[in-house]
Swiss-Prot record:
The gene is sepF. Cell division protein that is part of the divisome complex and is recruited early to the Z-ring. Probably stimulates Z-ring formation, perhaps through the cross-linking of FtsZ protofilaments. Its function overlaps with FtsA. Belongs to the SepF family. Keywords: Cell cycle, Cell division, Cytoplasm, Septation. Residues 33-48 have a biased composition (Polar residues). One of its GO terms (cellular component) is cytoplasm. Its main location: cytoplasm. The keyword Cell cycle applies. This is Cell division protein SepF. Disulfide bonds: none annotated. Coiled coil: none annotated. It is found in: Cytoplasm. The keyword Cell cycle applies.
Length: 148
């Protein structure tokens, strides 16, 4: 009877507990091996977010835009959100308004992890994150006298 109390409170013979622990460890190892040998469902491994699928479903677009007022910046930002690159020509805006639009678009591009580059006099290229741009045309802008 004394042993039953010791066993109940954990002061008894530890051999039975060691055997139980060894059995549980062996069972866990077998279960883990069975799960790793189980074929993966191809449907589970090809999960793609809806937004990512929509962005790559059609051809990529580059939008040409000439804003005239500051409120046009919202439409430019919406195109960036829709994964479209935008070439923006500010030649029809005064410098102060153009600077405000560039600041707005720069904030949008930063939030999306995209890029904005000046590619000409009052012309900018804004791209969403999945676009990559290479090269520079500033050398041509410096030599514009030789082109005409």
């Amino acid at each position: 009877m004394n042993n039953k109390f010791k066993d109940f409170f954990g002061f008894g013979d530890n051999d039975s507990y060691e055997e139980r622990d060894a059995y549980e460890e062996h069972y866990d190892e077998q279960e883990e091996m069975q799960n790793s040998n189980r074929p993966t469902n191809s449907r589970d491994s090809n999960v793609v977010s809806i937004k990512a699928g929509q962005a790559g479903s059609g051809p990529s677009k580059i939008v040409l835009y000439e804003p005239r007022v500051y409120s046009d910046a919202k439409e430019v930002a919406q195109n960036l959100l829709n994964q479209r690159a935008i070439i923006i020509n500010f030649s029809r805006m005064d410098d102060a308004s153009a600077r405000r639009v560039v600041d707005f678009i720069t904030g949008t591009v930063y939030a999306l992890n995209g890029e904005i580059q000046r590619i000409g006099d009052k012309i900018f290229l804004a791209t969403p994150p999945k676009f990559e741009t290479d090269g520079k045309i500033t050398e041509l802008l410096d030599k514009k006298d030789t082109l005409g």
